[in-house]
């Protein structure tokens, strides 16, 4: 399904010295090289540059921006490519696709999936991407059994600038992005910022999406060293569209029918829906990137990161057994009620942090990387029932029917090298050791 979009933008740049900026540009170019494939790596891959991304960046999620790369399939719950979208490569789902940003793992530590809805308009802050198809090179985070998507954020701008981009299209789909940057200050400092809003009514009925995000970056550069602090966040509110209509429902109610949130049908045959059948989530990401060039042959990358996620989704459920939610049956007019309609909330409060590194060597016929990382995830997931239809008795709005806490520590180290045997023949080796310790403790009502 195609979504028609119209875009417009305004950009203002100031001038700066080419000599001042050359050193900073060179430093930024050597970042995040250890997890990338090259022409001599025995891996199928596609590089997507900034210019290519800009041509298709009208607000849709990153899976849709990658939809024209080989062996890629994308889906969208709302039908507009915004909100809950998925990416498959060579038939492999998102749980087997490794995603990194600046070499830092982005996959959810428990499900191994990546929820792109929590990274709205992130492509506006991406310099380039590499998609590796099949089992890719050693990387950080979830195993890359099906594919890898390696993203590198924009480098610091050497010139002051201000930029606005907007687009509008089908189903009231819109995107507004504001970007500003200071350019190079005192030959050492740079600061950049982005604010974005994206929304759509969705192709599917009531599949509305409201997304807000920001991206902040500050950098300090010397002759051979760079330090960058990056903070980005996404806040989303999406109406559920993941229930999916059956063939029979679409034949009766139309292709855009959305069964999510349906409560009842009145005497006139009109269906009524629950207004708060929404997913609400805020995810904040922080990255501290350090790069040092020792010589033309040696460079070191070290990164620390922290991600905080907090949110919930709420839904109307009809005819549910009360005992499943830790509630006792109640009596109305002498009849015991064991099943009733209710509203439930599933909440989460998750934290993920750690560090990654890579030491890279390139000279003559040999290129090699020694890298790895150590990360820890702590999850706190729980469910509540704030309302039960016709409930008799006391019901706390904070009534909890399950809670589970998890802790996952993941460490890995890898060594890979490429050696040119002759002009047209090279040898490649890639070794990795990974250790995971995962514990979970839960209880049901």
Question: What residue ranges belong to the model's regions?
Answer:
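Outer-membrane beta-barrel proteins
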Residues: 167-175, 194-221, 261-291, 340-354, ...
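Short acidic/polar hinge/loop motifs at secondary-structure boundaries
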Residues: 88, 105-133, 152
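Transmembrane beta-barrel wall of Gram-negative outer-membrane proteins
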Residues: 161, 168-199, 204-241, 288-296, ...
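Non-catalytic regulatory/gating segments with a bias toward low-complexity or hydrophobic composition
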Residues: 66, 129-130, 149-151, 302
């Amino acid at each position: 399904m195609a979504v028609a979009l119209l875009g417009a933008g305004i950009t203002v740049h100031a001038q700066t010295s080419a000599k001042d900026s050359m050193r900073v540009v060179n430093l930024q170019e050597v970042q995040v090289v250890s997890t990338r494939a090259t022409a001599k790596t025995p891996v199928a891959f596609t590089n997507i540059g900034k210019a290519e991304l800009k041509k298709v960046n009208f607000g849709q999620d990153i899976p849709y921006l990658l939809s024209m790369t080989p062996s890629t399939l994308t889906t969208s719950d709302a039908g507009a490519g915004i909100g809950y979208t998925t990416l498959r490569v060579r038939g492999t789902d998102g749980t087997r696709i490794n995603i990194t940003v600046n070499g830092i793992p982005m996959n959810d530590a428990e499900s191994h999936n990546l929820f792109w809805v929590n990274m709205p308009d992130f492509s506006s802050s991406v310099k380039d991407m590499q998609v590796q198809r099949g089992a890719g090179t050693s990387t950080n985070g979830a195993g890359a059994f099906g594919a890898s998507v390696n993203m590198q954020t924009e480098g610091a701008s050497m010139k002051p600038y201000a930029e606005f981009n907007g687009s509008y299209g089908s189903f009231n789909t819109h995107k507004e992005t504001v970007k500003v940057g200071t350019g190079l200050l005192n030959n050492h400092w740079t600061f950049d910022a982005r604010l974005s809003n994206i929304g759509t009514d969705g192709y599917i009925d009531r599949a509305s999406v409201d997304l807000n995000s920001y991206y902040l970056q500050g950098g300090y550069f010397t002759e051979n060293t760079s330090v960058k602090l990056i903070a980005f966040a996404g806040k989303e509110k999406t109406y559920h569209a993941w229930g999916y209509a059956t063939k029979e429902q679409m034949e009766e109610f139309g292709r855009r029918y959305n069964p999510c949130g349906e409560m009842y049908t009145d005497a006139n045959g009109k269906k009524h829906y629950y207004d708060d059948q929404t997913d609400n989530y805020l995810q904040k990401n922080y990255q501290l990137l350090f790069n040092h060039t020792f010589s033309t042959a040696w460079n070191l990358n070290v990164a620390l990161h922290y991600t905080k996620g907090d949110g919930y989704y709420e839904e109307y459920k009809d005819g549910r057994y009360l005992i499943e939610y830790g509630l006792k049956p109640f009596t109305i007019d002498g009849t015991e009620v064991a099943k009733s309609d209710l509203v439930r909330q599933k909440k989460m409060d998750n934290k993920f942090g750690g560090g990654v590194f890579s030491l890279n060597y390139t000279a003559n016929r040999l290129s090699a990387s020694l890298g790895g990382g150590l990360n820890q995830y702590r999850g706190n997931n729980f469910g509540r029932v704030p309302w039960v239809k016709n409930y008799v008795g006391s019901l706390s709005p904070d009534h909890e029917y399950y809670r589970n806490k998890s802790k996952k520590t993941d460490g890995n180290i890898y060594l890979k090298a490429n050696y040119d045997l002759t002009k047209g023949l090279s040898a490649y080796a890639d070794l990795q050791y990974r250790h995971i310790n995962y514990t979970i403790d839960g209880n049901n009502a």
